From Swiss-Prot:
Family as reported in the entry's similarity comment: Belongs to the PBP/GOBP family.
Cited function: This major soluble protein in olfactory sensilla of male moths might serve to solubilize the extremely hydrophobic pheromone molecules and to transport pheromone through the aqueous lymph to receptors located on olfactory cilia.
Classification via InterPro entries: Odorant/phero-bd_Lep (IPR006072), PBP_GOBP_sf (IPR036728)
Keyword annotations from UniProtKB, A to Z: Pheromone response, Pheromone-binding, Transport
BP-aspect Gene Ontology terms: response to pheromone
GO molecular function, one term: pheromone binding
Assembly behavior: Homodimer.
Tissue expression pattern: Antenna.
Protein name: Pheromone-binding protein 1
Length: 35
């Protein structure tokens, strides 16, 4: 269901954000990853 996907994305995105800030990954790389 959409709601489950949304929750998974949110749960996945939080640690991703932390990693991104630690590694200083540009947003473009993250966008590529999600597309």
């Amino acid at each position: 269901s959409k709601e489950v996907m949304k929750q998974m994305t949110i749960n996945f995105a939080k640690p991703m954000e932390a990693c991104k800030q630690e590694l200083n990954v540009p947003d473009a790389v993250v966008q590529d990853f999600f597309n």
